[in-house]
């Protein structure tokens, strides 16, 4: 080109990058770090369609919604044949993560809705609302690339954990069982329920745990959560020992969260279990030198809090 410029042809990476910018903006705004240079970054991209970058962004939810708008545009244009750019799981995960990190009240519901759509269209395709018509790219063969992966499951479990609605924990259990069944059926490495996935489930339980001293119902809830967390830890250990696959091995994050779950029970028996877990992981770290088992400052803080319940 005489002016040194080159033609710009957007592809799926372009749109995923745009969504990632807005997802990061959602996290930044949610953490109270202000607007930053988000608008400058977006508006500096002159080749980006105007409908994807105009308007003000003032809250974390605004930014997350902007990422979702881009995804919806890519999806609609591909369905109708206006574009040959097909959305993929990576792009959906970016949007899921942005919504999760904006911590809006409806984030769990919104994330679950998108996740369920991913599952549905990846096995059924996208039927036209008018039964007598078809989308140009609505066939299931065109949508296999949006099937949820292990990252999708992890994001959804952690986001559902933000909700205070009744029955939320059963949803997390169902998701964990679902990904394990899908992996067993397909042996797809993208669906492997590794330690990171287990940690996401545990974190969801922790967000819905907690006990108020003298309040029997909350104490029972904390105990149930701690019991479920310990079951997940045991499952990880069993898989690791049976397969020798280190990707299943509980790490210090796993154990620290398990200790934390017991510390929330405000019960001497729970304190003893938490201390046992800490002593075991500490000995294992000293014996093996495995950096994944090295207690962190958070580990010491949690076990100290757990121990304080024993003496109060």
Segments predicted by a language model, with ranges:
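Fungal C-terminal region signature
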Residues: 221, 263, 273, 290, ...
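Intrinsically disordered terminal tails
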Residues: 253, 279, 298-305, 309-312
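Helix-start/N-cap signature of alpha-helical segments
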Residues: 7, 11, 60-63, 84, ...
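Hydrophobic packing position at a conserved site in alpha-helical tandem repeat units
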Residues: 1-4, 22, 45-48, 52, ...
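Pentatricopeptide repeat
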Residues: 11-16, 20, 88-93, 97, ...
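Short coil/turn connectors between adjacent alpha-helices in alpha-solenoid helical repeat scaffolds
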Residues: 23-66, 99-111, 159-171, 206-228, ...
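Low-complexity/repetitive intrinsically disordered segments
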Residues: 1-12, 311-312
